[in-house]
Amino acid sequence: MAAPEKMTFPEKPSHKKYRAALKKEKRKKRRQELARLRDSGLSQKEEEEDTFIEEQQLEEEKLLERERQRLHEEWLLREQKAQEEFRIKKEKEEAAKKRQEEQERKLKEQWEEQQRKEREEEEQKRQEKKEKEEALQKMLDQAENELENGTTWQNPEPPVDFRVMEKDRANCPFYSKTGACRFGDRCSRKHNFPTSSPTLLIKSMFTTFGMEQCRRDDYDPDASLEYSEEETYQQFLDFYEDVLPEFKNVGKVIQFKVSCNLEPHLRGNVYVQYQSEEECQAALSLFNGRWYAGRQLQCEFCPVTRWKMAICGLFEIQQCPRGKHCNFLHVFRNPNNEFWEANRDIYLSPDRTGSSFGKNSERRERMGHHDDYYSRLRGRRNPSPDHSYKRNGESERKSSRHRGKKSHKRTSKSRERHNSRSRGRNRDRSRDRSRGRGSRSRSRSRSRRSRRSRSQSSSRSRSRGRRRSGNRDRTVQSPKSK
C-alpha cells in the first residue's frame, strides 16, 4: 500500500514579504488609477481642442463671410460708378453725334445755298452774255443794213463814265536804284521805264571768262582757279580804254561804271551818264543794235541818276555781307579815279559846283577825317572873318605862333600833372597812357601844322592880292599925275 500523502500547508509569509507584496499591490492600484485619470484627461483635452478648433473654424467662416460681403459691396460700388461713367460717355457721344449731324446739316445747307447761288450767277451770266450777243448781233445787222444802204459806219463810242483803272502797284526799289531787277518781267512791283534819261544802260556788254564761269562755281569749285581778279581787272582796263572814247564822241560823259556783280541781271552791265538827255538819246540811236565782241548791244534808258543809292558802299571797303548775291552795284574802280564827282552826286547839287568845291574836295581827300574834324572845331572857335583879316599876314602869323606857344605850354603842364599822378601806378598802364598821349599830341601837331600852312597861304594870297591892287591903283593914278 502506498504511504499516505502528507498534507502541506502554505507557509505563512513573513511580515517583510507581506509588506512588500502590499506595497506592490498599492503601487499597482495607483498606476491603474493614474492610467484611468490620464485617459480621462486626454479625452477631455481632445474635446477641448476639438471645441477650440470648431470655434476657430466658425470665426474664420464669419471673417470670410464678412470679407466676401465687403468685396461684394465694393464690386457693387465699382459697377455703379462704371455704369454712371458709361452713361455719361454715352450721353457725350450722343451729344457729339448730334452736333456733328447738325454741322453736317448746316454744311449741306450752305453747300446747297452756294450751289444755288452759283447756278443763279451762271444763269445770270448766261443771260447777260445772251443779251450782249443779241445786242451785238443787232448792232451788226444794223451796221450791215447801213453798209448796204451806202452809209458810213464806225465803232460805237464808249460811255462817258467808262474808265480803265490800272491796278495801283508800288514801284520796284531795285529797278529805281540800279535800273535792273532780278525778277525782270515777273516782278510784282511796277517798273517805270523812262522814255528819256541822261543815263544809258547797255546790258551784259562787258564779259570775261571769270564772269561767264561764275555759274559753274556751285558744280565745279576748281573753275575759279583758272582766272584771277587781277586778270579780270586788267581786262576791264582794256575795255575801259577801248569803249570810253566812243561814248565820249557823242557828248560829255559825267559817269561811266561797269558792274562786276555775278547776278545775271547785273553781270557786265555798263552805265554811261551824259550831261544832257539829248546826248543820251543820240548815244542810244547810235549804239543800239551795234556789235561789240561778237554780241549785239541792247541799249536802253536807265532811271539811275543818284549813284550813292545805286553803288554798294560796303563793297568798296570789302565788307559786303551778301557777296556775289548783292543786288546793289559792285563796280570796277575807274583808272585814275575818273568820274569821282559823279560817285558823290556832285552834279545834282547846284550850289556845290565850281573850282572852289573841287579844291575843297581835293583837300578833303588829302586830309584825314580826324584832322578835318578838329580843324572844323578850331574854325568854329575863330573870330569872324571881318576882324581876322589884317593888312598883312604878320599879325595872323604872330597870333598863330602865340596860340602854338600857349597850346605847347598847356600840353607840357598836362604832361607834368599826368606824370605826377602816374608815378604810383604800374608800368603797363603808364605805357598805355603814354601811347595814347603821344597819338593825341601827334594829331594835335598835325592839325596845328595844317592850320599854320592854311593861315600862311591865306595871308600870302591876301598880301599878293593887296600888292596887285596897289600896283593897279598906281598905274591908274600915274596918268593923272602926268
UniProtKB/Swiss-Prot annotation:
Its main location: nucleus. InterPro entries: Nucleotide-bd_a/b_plait_sf (IPR012677), RBD_domain_sf (IPR035979), RRM_dom (IPR000504), RRM_dom_euk (IPR003954), U2AF_small (IPR009145), Znf_CCCH (IPR000571). Residues 14-31, 399-412, 436-454 have a biased composition (Basic residues). Residues 360-375, 383-398, 413-435 have a biased composition (Basic and acidic residues). It is found in: Nucleus. GO terms for cellular component: nucleoplasm; spliceosomal complex; U12-type spliceosomal complex; U2AF complex. Residues 46-58 have a biased composition (Acidic residues). Widely expressed. The modification Phosphoserine is found at residues 349, 384. A zinc finger (C3H1-type) spans 166-194, 306-333. Pfam families: RRM_1 (PF00076), zf-CCCH (PF00642). It comes from the Eukaryota. Signal peptide: none annotated. It is linked to Orofaciodigital syndrome 21: A form of orofaciodigital syndrome, a group of heterogeneous disorders characterized by malformations of the oral cavity, face and digits, and associated phenotypic abnormalities that lead to the delineation of various subtypes. OFD21 is an X-linked recessive form characterized by postaxial polydactyly of the hands, hallux duplication, palatal defects, fused incisors, accessory oral frenula and tongue nodules, in association with brain anomalies that range from pituitary anomalies to alobar holoprosencephaly. Pre-mRNA-binding protein required for splicing of both U2- and U12-type introns. Selectively interacts with the 3'-splice site of U2- and U12-type pre-mRNAs and promotes different steps in U2 and U12 intron splicing. Recruited to U12 pre-mRNAs in an ATP-dependent manner and is required for assembly of the pre-spliceosome, a precursor to other spliceosomal complexes. For U2-type introns, it is selectively and specifically required for the second step of splicing. Component of the U11/U12 snRNPs that are part of the U12-type spliceosome. Interacts (via RS domain) with SRSF1 and SRSF2. Interacts with U2AF2/U2AF65. This is U2 small nuclear ribonucleoprotein auxiliary factor 35 kDa subunit-related protein 2. It comes from Homo sapiens. The gene is ZRSR2.
